[in-house]
């Protein structure tokens, strides 16, 4: 592997550039495990590896909202530490990190569920988990550029002029997507459709905003199909742009309903 690291993004090259990029999990552990199995990964020594040398990448927002948040976090921590996986920062990942730092954050939008699971652990286990999460988070970045910058992975958004750069403004777009600076009645940022104007060279895979299906728009694709709302957990297999999905219908009882699609090629 060749790597050039610049502050909070990474440029990576591997002998074999084969990736399985997973959308927003949000605590849906059962669906994550089903998807990992369907992708052909095999468990060995506590980690999942692929017989063809494929690598897992998370677009972020692994926890919050679902019912098995710590299990999802633990899976990705192990995969990053020992399984050759990568995990770009999502806004929920960043919020949990700030919570662990001791910053004042609102226990809302699903974080309260993750914290409740943490609080149920014995103090020693809680502190060990905190340390493992923080070390893992600090080892990762806000966006990845892969395979000679052919492919980019980010959580919220990445404008063409930001590729290969980093700043506080770029950081905000990576976490939240492009916004107007205003907030809606629920306190969430009003979003702009940055993908509709994207004209960059890298193919950008992202999540954050729930989309009914993984539709390719201007060399971008949103693979958050709202599994935690009863939609789908999506994986994008690269190269080739093949989508594989697992349904999250059972989650409709706990969260607002959403819809998605089935396995597709794009």
Model feature map: region roles:
Residues 24, 61, 90-91, 114, ...:
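Divalent metal-coordination and catalytic microenvironments
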Residues 14-20, 145-152:
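Beta-strand-turn-beta hairpins that frame and shape the catalytic cleft
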Residues 50-53, 65-145, 149, 160, ...:
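Active-site neighborhood of divalent metal-dependent phosphoester bond hydrolases
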Residues 2, 13-14, 172, 176-266:
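Acidic, His/Gly-rich catalytic cores of divalent-metal-dependent hydrolytic chemistry
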Residues 1-73:
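N-terminal active-site segment of His-dependent metallophosphoesterases
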Residues 21, 56-58, 87-88, 152, ...:
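Residue-level marker for buried hydrophobic side chains located in beta-strands
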Residues 27-30, 64-67, 93-97, 160-161, ...:
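Active-site environment of divalent metal-dependent phosphoester hydrolases
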Residues 152-170:
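Divalent-metal (often Zn2+) His-rich catalytic cores of metallo-beta-lactamase-fold enzymes
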